[in-house]
Amino acid sequence: MSNTMPGRPMRLAGREVKGAAQLREIVDACQTVRIAAVDNEGVFIVPMSFGYDWADPAGLEGSEEPRLALWVHSTVEGRKVDVFDAEPRVAIEMDVQEGVITGNYACAYSYAYRSIVGTGTVHRIQSPEMKRYGLERIMAHLAPDALPGFTDQALARTKIYCIDIEKFTGKQRA
């Protein structure tokens, strides 16, 4: 399986995470996704809580790669809302920080991590049923023991977005 971003192989190929189960473990361990977007003011990046849907390749006819969709929420106005609605192409990054790797001299130090980097398309969710589903995915990921339920008033003042991740790679440094 290859989730390599189009056009460029990973420079340190030995650090690439290739298995669907290992990639999902990284996504599941992350609490925050950083979403990069571009508007007329320039490039910006915003950290967000997220939930996700995952489909393994075995369950996808004609696919050798897993499918990942991220669910995020926002208030009803602001720069992020404006750019997501105007320019849906985004890049994402999420990581699990594992700690400092010590060395015998300063340049031998490094950092252990596991990460996912990718690109996708943001879709604003309109229907109350799908907005509720998106919030449930976020809560299932971040607070699985929380009591379910969202009022119609909460749904009305919350924007929900689903980001279809089209290409992503996993990388780790132990």
Predicted regions span which residues?
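Charged, gly/pro-rich active-site loop segments
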Residues: 2-14, 97-174
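Short, basic/aromatic recognition patches
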Residues: 5-34
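A generic structural signal for nonpolar/aromatic side chains embedded in well-ordered alpha-helices
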Residues: 26-27, 83-84, 138
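Short beta-strand segments
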Residues: 30-76
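A generic structural signal for short beta-strands and their flanking turns/coil linkers
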Residues: 31-33, 46, 66-68, 86-90, ...
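Short, structured patches in soluble enzyme cores that scaffold and shape functional sites
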Residues: 37-39, 74, 94-96, 164-167
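Short, charge-rich binding segments
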Residues: 62-64, 81-86, 106-110
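Helix-adjacent hinge/juxtasegments
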Residues: 73-74, 79-100
